[in-house]
Swiss-Prot record:
Organism ancestry: Bacteria, Bacillati, Actinomycetota, Actinomycetes, Propionibacteriales
Protein name: ATP synthase subunit alpha
Residues at the site labelled Required for activity: 375
Chief place of localization: membrane
Top EC class, one word: translocase
Length: 545
């Protein structure tokens, strides 16, 4: 057997010859696929064996698509745009890229589509700082820290009983036309004070993702934000109802990518998904057209993962990563107040709490129509300032007892004094929690209102006059006391501040007139008696004596 010898000079000569004759263009083989079938926003393509999952593909007419189904012989592609010109036999090429959107400060104040392109007619977006992939891994356990900084919504019913913290995922759920979007918009407007402070630790950048909404609805939202001066720190990502299902599917991920860019820079972000029900329906339509096996309610098996991988990106990052945060307010629309349906239960299990809006309360003019009984925040008091935590501790149980007592009182004719007082105070607390749209309250004013309600300062005020009396008290405190400033700066509501607030309530009561023109009980004005009346009174007393 011949001995095997290795000659280094032969190996070196072979390598030198290969390098000298190497031509780069012959090394890269461009794959070209062919459309087999096309329709309903879905194309089946053959001939791209190296395509990646979620890779961007370019059709012959320039339209882009996402490779969602990688089968043995075909690729199922979701078309991102107009399907005209995508016919059987037309060519498809891979780009080697996954879907991404531009990110940066230039997006503040703009309205963009699901691909990050401006649609507000204000020209190109300036200040783009790069691109970020839509499908990006959420922060790991060790990259996060606990949620403990409050994110104020400006709504008394939420900030007092269902507090939201920076980095939390809080679901807003309810039937159509119950005020879900109004809560989200009020929360954005309430961040204006923080933005104007100029303090990066206080400022919150807001992203409103409109999924499958009417164009008129989004225009209305944009107009409300502009009127309130909130558009300068807000980005609207718009995937209207007229868009193909693919755009509604990717829009939440596009908004999340824009927000994550700021979060990893150590900034604070609020993102609103309005609403994820429509995203799930778009994903269901795509999956059925791609012939994926349907499951419960015809949704595909991975619809839970659709929302979990999106909402898990909301986090409060560790200090090592800059301490930024992204707070998520996903919105889910129910049918007939059924929270046990598939998508609502999925998102409830993913999020850190839910705000349930009841249509009966909304129709009874109790707005925001928050059902305190089944609404909860799993972060709880950790996301409240000390002042609010100290005054709101008994509010939720007081309202729960009021609801029980109210149901009992419908069938009971005689109630003892304690029960009647409980009913009277509960009615005033419910009135106190009413709030007009686009009129968020600063947290220090909320503290005064909640404290006054829970300590009986409104008990002698007629229910119909509670909000007017509250406004008078807050106006008095703004001009006659530094109580509000103390709460805002220290976050505490000490005994001295309570005494000053109690004095303000009493002072306002002296001059407050109810809607029927009367003074409050114990604060009536008595005019001096005329001389003849005094003489007559003396005669009457003398006769009795």
């Amino acid at each position: 057997m011949a001995e095997l010898t290795i000659r280094p000079e032969e190996i070196r000569d072979a390598l030198d010859n290969f390098v000298q004759n190497y031509e780069p263009e012959t090394a890269v083989r461009e794959e070209v696929g062919t459309v087999v079938t096309s329709g309903d926003g879905i194309a089946h393509v053959e001939g791209l064996p190296s395509a990646m999952a979620n890779e961007l593909l370019r059709f012959e007419n320039g339209t882009m698509g996402i490779a969602l189904n990688l089968e043995e012989r075909q690729i199922g592609v979701v078309v991102l745009g107009d399907s005209d010109g995508i016919d059987e036999g037309s060519t498809v090429r891979g780009t080697g890229e996954v879907l991404s959107v531009p990110v940066g400060e230039g997006y503040l104040g703009r309205v963009v589509d699901a691909m990050g392109n401006p649609v507000d007619g204000l020209g190109e977006i300036k200040g783009v700082e790069g691109r970020r992939a839509l499908e990006i891994q959420a922060a790991g356990v060790m990259d996060r820290q606990e949620v403990r900084e409050p994110l104020q919504t400006g709504l008394k019913a939420i900030d007092s009983m269902i507090p939201i913290g920076r980095g939390q995922r809080q679901l807003i759920i309810g039937d159509r036309k119950t005020g879900k979007t109004a809560i989200a918009i009020d929360t954005i407007i309430n961040q204006k004070g923080n933005w104007e402070s100029g303090d990066p630790q206080k400022q919150v950048r807001c992203i409103y993702v409109a999924i499958g909404q009417k164009g008129s609805t989004v225009a209305e939202v944009k107009g409300a934000l502009e009127k309130a001066g909130a558009m300068e720190y807000t980005t609207i990502v718009h995937a209207p109802a007229s868009d193909p299902a693919g755009f509604k599917y990717i829009a939440p991920y596009a908004g999340s990518a824009i927000g994550q860019h700021w979060m990893y820079q150590g900034k604070h972000v609020l993102i609103i998904f309005d609403d994820l029900t429509k995203q799930a329906e778009a994903y269901r339509a795509m999956s059925l057209l791609l012939r994926r096996p349907p499951g419960r309610e015809a949704y595909p098996g991975d619809v839970f993962y659709l929302h979990s991988r999106l909402l898990e990106r909301c986090a409060k990052l560790s200090d090592d990563l800059g301490g930024g945060s992204m707070t998520g307010l996903p919105i889910i629309e129910t049918k007939a107040n059924d929270v046990s349906a598939f998508i609502p239960t999925n998102v409830i299990s993913i999020t850190d709490g839910q705000i349930f809006l009841q249509s009966d309360l909304f129709n009874a003019n109790q707005r925001p129509a928050v059902d305190v009984g089944i609404s909860v925040s799993r972060v709880g008091g950790a996301a409240q300032i000390k002042a609010m935590k100290s005054v709101a501790g008994t509010l939720k149980i007081s309202l729960a007892q009021y609801r029980d007592m109210q149901a009992f009182a419908m069938f009971a004719s005689d109630l003892d004094d304690t029960s009647r007082r409980q009913l009277d105070r509960g009615a005033r607390l419910m009135e106190l929690l009413k709030q007009g749209q686009f009129s968020p309250y600063p947290v220090e004013e909320q503290v005064i209102s909640v404290w006054g309600g829970t300590t009986g300062k409104f008990d002698d005020v007629p229910v119909g006059d509670v909000l007017r009396f509250e406004g008078d008290v807050l106006e008095y405190l703004r001009s006659h006391s530094n109580v509000l400033t103390t709460i805002r700066e220290t976050g505490k509501f000490d005994d001295e501040a309570k005494d000053a607030a109690a004095a303000a309530f009493e002072e306002v009561k002296k001059g407050f007139k109810t809607s029927d023109g009367k003074m409050l009980a114990g604060h009536e004005e008595f005019s001096p008696m005329a001389d003849e009346d005094i003489d007559q009174a003396k005669i009457v007393r003398a006769k009795k004596g």
